[in-house]
């Protein structure tokens, strides 16, 4: 078993680690890359939520994606099926893309690059949901709020790029 499978299985084996590892990583990255002062003076698209909404929203999303990974792991703990093996790769890849967004947008101040990352992330999560469906349909369903939020985040990121 390669490193990706080992990481996925060690994280997803228990529902609490599956849920808390993404939350902890997201919290660390979120607190490492705060919006710059000039960000507050930039134009925002309509329906932009207050900054205080992002922390709770992402916490819930990380919990749901983590729980989805646990459900997929439980469906095939030995990772025998292609859906399980490919899903583990996609899950780790989408986490990497997710965790890259804040450094790109806030750290490097590259909103267009962050938008490209968000497009890749959305594609990965959609592919992950499709991959997990035959193995664990409930796991795929737990990704629906995440996909919906990524669509909204794409709107916000694109709006920011167009307005500034």
Curated annotation (Swiss-Prot):
Keyword annotations of the record: Membrane, Mitochondrion, Transmembrane, Transmembrane helix
Broad class of where this protein is predominantly found: mitochondrion
CDD domains: TSPO_MBR
Gene3D superfamilies: TspO/MBR protein
Residues passing through the membrane, by range: 16-34, 52-72, 89-106, 112-132, 141-163
InterPro entries in the cross-refs: TspO/MBR-related_sf (IPR038330), TspO_MBR (IPR004307)
Domain of life: Eukaryota
Membrane topology value: Multi-pass membrane protein
Presence of the UniProt keyword Lipid biosynthesis in the record: no
GO-annotated cellular components: mitochondrial outer membrane; mitochondrion
Protein name from the UniProt record: Translocator protein homolog
Protein species of origin: Schizosaccharomyces pombe (strain 972 / ATCC 24843) (Fission yeast)
């Amino acid at each position: 078993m390669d490193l990706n499978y080992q990481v996925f299985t060690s994280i997803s084996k228990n529902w609490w680690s599956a849920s808390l590892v993404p939350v902890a990583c997201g919290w660390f990255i979120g607190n490492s890359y705060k919006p710059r002062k000039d960000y507050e003076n930039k134009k925002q698209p309509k329906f932009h939520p207050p900054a205080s909404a992002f922390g709770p929203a992402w916490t819930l999303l990380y919990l749901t994606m983590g729980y989805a990974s646990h459900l997929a792991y439980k469906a095939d703990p030995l990772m025998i099926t292609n859906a399980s093996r490919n899903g583990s790769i996609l899950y780790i890849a989408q986490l990497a893309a997710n965790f890259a967004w804040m450094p790109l947008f806030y750290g490097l101040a590259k909103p267009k690059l962050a938008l490209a990352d968000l497009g890749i992330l959305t594609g990965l999560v959609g592919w992950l949901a499709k991959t997990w469906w035959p193995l664990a349909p409930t796991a795929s369903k737990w990704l629906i709020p995440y996909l919906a939020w990524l669509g909204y985040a794409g709107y916000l990121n694109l709006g920011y790029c167009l307005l500034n």
